[in-house]
């Protein structure tokens, strides 16, 4: 993995880790100026979320396939993350969205009206860097 990709993933992970304890809280009810624990998921300090885990899983699939997009490899890594706690900060998968869980359990994307979220936007960085 080259330096630019590492820097991008590190930046994503740090920002994500700062935000995990404050997820789902209204603005202006907290100061995210230092690493802290807790939050809705009661996670220890230094925990990143599904966003970083799935970004790392995507990078791993791209690395494994010589920078070629292999959707099956990405899907496999996402399933390993969800079911076996891979790519997590503390060997604990949490905050798996319903749409993500259903798609991974079925091994196919969903196409109903309410299955379109913003998760892909948070995991697209590796495709721009590889």
Q: Where are the language model's segments positioned?
A:
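Structured, active/binding-site neighborhoods that engage oxygen-rich ligands
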Residues: 1-130
């Amino acid at each position: 993995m080259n330096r630019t990709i590492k820097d991008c993933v590190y930046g994503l992970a740090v920002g994500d880790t700062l935000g995990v304890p404050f997820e789902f809280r209204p603005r202006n009810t907290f100061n995210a100026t230092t690493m802290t624990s807790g939050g809705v998921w009661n996670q220890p300090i230094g925990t990143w979320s599904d966003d970083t885990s799935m970004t790392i899983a995507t990078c791993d699939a791209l690395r494994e396939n010589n920078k070629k997009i292999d959707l099956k490899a990405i899907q496999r890594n996402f399933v390993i993350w969800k079911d076996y706690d891979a790519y997590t900060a503390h060997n604990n998968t949490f905050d798996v969205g319903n749409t993500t869980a259903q798609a991974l359990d079925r091994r196919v994307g969903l196409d109903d009206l309410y299955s379109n979220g913003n998760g892909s936007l948070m995991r697209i960085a590796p495709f721009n860097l590889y």
